[in-house]
A protein has these predicted regions:
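PLP-dependent amino-acid enzyme catalytic core
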Residues: 1-296
């Protein structure tokens, strides 16, 4: 393996790993993109790097400046690590209900962490909305400026996956990929990878994996925002259309995974949480006409 160019050079280029149990049960080859091998431990490192690079290229982020974002955790970790490497400070707004491990990790990365109540998006104190207001307040007094990363509506998020994740999957499979699925929060991974793969082969099937408590499944299936049930999964699901999802019409089928099924899938040693567990269960169901995975 060749040496990487500094810390940010370690982001991306993650391997594909065959998920043996899921492959055996379906008779298909199901591969997982090992995004946990990114330095921040998640796929969100890619979005963080591209959001920061985009702000630098536009002249909106200067040395010593501040990055502000509202996040359930992983994007904040990525922004903090990349920001540290490039000389920026990071302020993160997070719902107080998120896991203690994420809070501890963010503080370990030197983040100025602001916790807010977990409220619906319509509430001005919703973590994503409040972070935008906070960014404006900090920018007014910060001599080196401050940016709002705005991962939900910043198309640099999608571009990061269009330029890296999608092409990596294509190259690592020698173009022999039949379908792709992932869970959705901002929509950057699904849309970026989906566009990249469809450009290379329009027959590649794109499946949207949504958790209970989110309205994205019903939006794509029935064109209405109608969440069902409750969610315990952190960082995925949504009840409004983000800019990264807007206009993305390449979803061949939306699928809905119940979280108790995701918990079962997450017991595999490579899967670290319910979130990738839901994605694995969706991959198992992709060849089935059913759109809701039954409880075990």
């Amino acid at each position: 393996m060749r040496p990487r160019d500094g810390f940010v050079g370690t982001v991306g280029d993650t391997p594909l790993i065959k998920l043996r149990r899921a492959s055996e049960e379906t008779g298909c080859t199901i591969l997982g993109k090992a995004e946990f091998l990114n330095p921040g431990g998640s796929v969100k490192d890619r979005a963080a790097l591209y959001i920061i690079k985009d702000a630098e290229e536009r002249g909106r982020l200067r040395p010593g400046g501040v990055i502000v974002e509202g996040t359930a955790g992983n994007t904040g970790i990525g922004l903090a690590l990349v920001g540290n490497a490039r000389g920026y400070r990071t302020v993160i707004v997070m719902p107080e209900t998120q896991s203690q491990e994420k809070k501890d990790m963010l503080r370990l990365c030197g983040v100025d962490l602001r916790l807010v109540p977990a409220v619906p998006y319509a509430n001005p104190m919703h973590y994503a909305r409040y972070s935008g207001v906070l960014a404006e307040e900090i920018a007014a007094s910060e001599p080196n400026g401050a940016i709002w990363a705005n991962q939900f509506d910043n198309l640099a998020n999608r571009r990061g996956h269009y330029e890296t994740t999608g092409p990596e999957i294509w190259e690592q499979t020698d173009g022999k990929v039949d379908g792709f699925t992932c869970s959705v929060g901002t929509g950057g991974t699904l849309s970026g990878v989906g566009i990249a793969l469809k450009e290379r082969n329009p027959k590649v099937q794109i499946y949207l994996s949504d958790c209970m408590g989110s309205g994205i499944y019903n939006w794509y299936a029935h064109h209405e925002w109608k969440p069902e049930g409750n969610s315990i999964t952190e960082g995925i699901g949504n009840n409004h259309e983000t800019a990264n999802l807007a206009g993305f019409a390449s979803v061949d089928a939306p699928l809905q995974a119940r979280e108790n099924v995701g918990v079962v899938a997450a017991r595999g040693r490579m899967l670290s949480s319910v979130r990738p567990g839901c994605g694995t269960m969706t991959a198992r169901a992709a060849s089935s006409p059913a759109t809701t995975l039954p409880a075990p």
